[in-house]
């Protein structure tokens, strides 16, 4: 009888140990991201084969701001193990609210810059601008469309660029001048680029658009091999996107493996075509059209001293008042 009891106890302990091991060894990793996150089937399969983990379907939670705010609201019971897509304008919110286990890791970047329609300017005999500061000039009246900084991350990034470049007491006059010079404000990037921009969908009325330094890589004329647009790579806003392990994640080890994979050359090399961003690893070669027509900006505004978190809403409200001529 004693041997039987001992055997049962041993079996119970062994079973509990196995159950504990199973509980401590998750077989999947969940990712929360912004809406633009893309990972190819081949890359997904490569990660899963190397790690033994399955990537669960991505929880796409909106733009960088919406993503960050939703993760703050669910930080005690996170919706994922790893986050991708918090950018440098919302990194402070993530850190302040303690949603990240460890540090945010830069994965990619994009430069918010103005683009112009080369054909339009050549046809009209107008010299294209070399800086957004010039857009207040009368010869550019009624030619520019931007995204609303209260509804668009692209627009908000550029608002920050004007504040960083012109100062907290100087940016207002530039926007007032742009209002008086007939600037068009679109709700988001897709509306501005594909509807309002003359070279986006071909039917717009504005030959200057707030977009990205990478955009000319996607307007190459197959017949000539040349791009029909150009980026004004002067005083752009560099938007950096991060990944991080979410605090209270069910599989933090798996999350770290996925972040390491995002830094590997295969994932980095896929970023331009997949998400229209530059790899943070500068040793990774860019696609041919990117290297030729869409180099990253060498001139971007230093916004490191701006307190995005404390003043974001005030700046947005002040911008709204300016554009409504209040």
What role is predicted for each listed range?
Residues 1-29, 326:
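Short, low-complexity disordered leader/linker segments with a strong preference
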Residues 21-93, 201:
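Early extracytoplasmic/lumenal segment of secretory-pathway proteins
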Residues 115-120, 163, 239-254, 270-274:
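A bilobed periplasmic-binding-protein/Venus flytrap-type ligand-binding module shared by bacterial periplasmic
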Residues 78-83, 99-118, 132-134, 142-149:
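A structural signal for short loop-to-beta-strand junctions that line the ligand-binding cleft
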Residues 101-107, 133, 207, 220-237, ...:
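Short beta-strand->loop
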Residues 161-234:
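Ligand-binding pocket segment of bilobal, Venus flytrap-like solute-binding proteins
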Residues 269-326:
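C-terminal capping/gating helix-and-loop segments adjacent to ligand/active sites or protein-protein/ligand interfaces
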Residues 139-150, 262-285:
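Periplasmic-binding protein-like
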């Amino acid at each position: 009888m004693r041997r039987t009891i001992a055997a049962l106890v041993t079996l119970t302990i062994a079973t509990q140990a196995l159950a504990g091991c199973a509980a401590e060894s998750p077989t999947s990793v969940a990712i929360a991201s912004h809406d633009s996150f893309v990972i190819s089937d081949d890359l997904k399969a490569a990660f899963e084969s190397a790690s033994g983990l399955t990537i669960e379907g991505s929880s796409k939670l909106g733009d960088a701001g919406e993503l960050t705010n939703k993760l703050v609201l669910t930080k005690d019971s996170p919706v994922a193990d790893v986050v991708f897509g918090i950018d440098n304008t919302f990194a402070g919110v993530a850190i302040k609210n303690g949603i990240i286990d460890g540090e945010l890791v830069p994965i990619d970047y994009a430069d918010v810059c103005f683009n112009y329609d080369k054909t339009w300017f050549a046809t009209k005999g107008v010299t294209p601008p070399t800086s957004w500061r010039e857009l207040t000039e009368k010869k550019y009246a009624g030619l520019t469309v931007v995204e609303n900084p209260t509804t668009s991350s692209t627009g908000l990034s550029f608002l920050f660029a004007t504040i960083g470049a012109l100062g907290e007491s100087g940016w207002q006059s530039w926007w007032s001048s742009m209002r008086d010079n007939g600037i068009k404000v679109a709700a988001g990037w897709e509306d501005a680029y594909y509807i309002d921009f003359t070279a986006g969908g071909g039917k717009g009325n504005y030959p200057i658009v707030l977009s990205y330094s990478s955009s000319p890589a996607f307007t190459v004329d197959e017949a000539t091999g040349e791009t029909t647009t150009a980026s004004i790579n002067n005083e752009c806003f560099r938007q950096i996107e991060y990944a991080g392990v979410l605090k209270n994640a069910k599989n933090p080890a798996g999350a770290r493996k996925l972040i390491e994979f995002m830094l590997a050359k295969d994932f980095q090399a896929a970023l331009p075509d997949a998400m229209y961003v530059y790899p943070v690893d500068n040793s990774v070669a860019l696609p041919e059209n990117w290297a030729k027509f869409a180099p990253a900006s060498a001139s971007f505004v230093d916004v490191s001293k701006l307190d995005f978190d404390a003043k974001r809403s005030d700046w947005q409200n002040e911008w709204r008042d300016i554009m409504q001529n209040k």
